[in-house]
Amino acid sequence: MSSNNQSSSVAQAATSARTVSAGSAEATDANSTASNNNNNSSSTAAAGNNSDNSSPTTGTGTGASTGKLHGGHTAVNTKERVVDSVPFPPSHKLTLAEVFDQRTGKPNHELLKQHFILEGRIEEAPALKIIQDGAALLRQEKTMIDIEAPVTVCGDIHGQFYDLMKLFEVGGSPASTKYLFLGDYVDRGYFSIECVLYLWSLKITYPQTLFLLRGNHECRHLTEYFTFKQECKIKYSERVYDACMDAFDCLPLAALMNQQFLCVHGGLSPEIHELEDIRRLDRFKEPPAFGPMCDLLWSDPLEDFGNEKNSDFYTHNSVRGCSYFYSYAACCDFLQNNNLLSIIRAHEAQDAGYRMYRKSQTTGFPSLITIFSAPNYLDVYNNKAAVLKYENNVMNIRQFNCSPHPYWLPNFMDVFTWSLPFVGEKVTEMLVNVLNICSDDELMTEESEEPLSDDEAALRKEVIRNKIRAIGKMARVFSVLREESESVLQLKGLTPTGALPLGALSGGKQSLKNAMQGFSPNHKITSFAEAKGLDAVNERMPPRRDQPPTPSEDPNQHSQQGGKNGAGHG
């Protein structure tokens, strides 16, 4: 498109583009933004444990059911499930022949959907084929893809598979709706591999109408640090994880929607002046800790975006520990230089599921829009999720709430590992009690006819006492392990991420107690702001070997000051 045509398109969109509240019969102009406060009823997800021991899910394990006998005694039935009203997950793993249609060679995504909802799994072969076939399609796409409206834009998913199912209910069937996902499909939630397999199967089935961008979590560094690698190894294998990493390297970094909107996971970079700079990037690699590729995935708008105290275009992102904060001035400068209407991004949880930032003075349209599609993020944020539907120059924000999902113990811990310290403590207590049934006088008594000498009797008594002391020490060790295990589980339950604060575990029992100070077991996180504050440490880039110098130490640091000609790009 020529520059004149782009200007005409932007001008036309600026006057006609509107934001409409879903379900509302009345549209508003670009100066007003609304949303659908739609509290759709949640579909009930099947809860239960998996067929192996590595997936302990609340209320579904085999256990002892009871019944009353005469005299008030209780009969225990160890062959029946305690909660038999919840369907047991399918033990059968779908095969390659079952997953893929022999005629079309494409996966049966509807079968996968129903199987995953029941917590079923598939064999490694079809899992690898889905990931690799999807990667082959992604590899053919440009680094910045072009998408025409109508399109539904979705933000972070973060392994919340059951909420992803709700998203498609709200947004429309992928068979008839064009979708653009802005990244962060994995980590934090406990159903990340299901999200990847299902989205990749949709990509294979609808390659021209379903588009996937890369988020900052689609990399080896973060998936090793958070939960995705562990999830793949528990549910499938490390080969599946490695295939996912290779596929993530193929994901495009940005999309140009309708020649009007730049869609990206994070935001702008001081090294990206124009759209062509994005097209020239080499994306087929692990994202670096600094540079334009890192910025597209990691950067954020300033918290006081639109009300900045200074004229800096970019400042160091102290919240993420990498990349930059970009200002309203930097955003407007980029939009004007590239004939764009707005930037649509994800990357940050929003209480309402979305946020419209200050409008551009030249177009009257929000210069920046954040969309977030993981409701009740981490099960504690209490936020709504949203998708953005853009059609006929009308922007429609649709919100939705979270759906029920099966429960996993923190870090995919199985029930036997979780209960072992408690069981060990009780077993050693019983053993100590058994050995303590005889008194000191009884220890001196010998049942044999030949009496022992004083030295032999004293030695035997000391041997038995040493055994009792050793078992007592073992009991105390198990007691400490049990207490620490309970503290760890309790502390994980009190933090939004299910992860321990840094250094809490290495310091032992006292560190755990200190970390729990300020946390009340009866306290429940009730506000979005509280959850976001507690979770801030987990939004930073984890330490890595190629960490760049801080802005003050970097001799090649880009100029952060905006100028008359947009010189803030450095």
From Swiss-Prot:
It comes from the Eukaryota. Its EC number is 3.1.3.16. InterPro entries: Calcineurin-like_PHP_ApaH, Metallo-depent_PP-like, MPP_PP2B, PP2B, Ser/Thr-sp_prot-phosphatase. One of its GO terms (biological process) is meiotic cell cycle. Residues 1-67 have a biased composition (Low complexity). Keywords: Calcium, Calmodulin-binding, Hydrolase, Iron, Metal-binding, Protein phosphatase, Zinc. The keyword Zinc applies. Interacts with sra in a complex that contains CanA-14F. Calcium-dependent, calmodulin-stimulated protein phosphatase. This subunit may have a role in the calmodulin activation of calcineurin. This is Serine/threonine-protein phosphatase 2B catalytic subunit 2. It comes from Drosophila melanogaster.
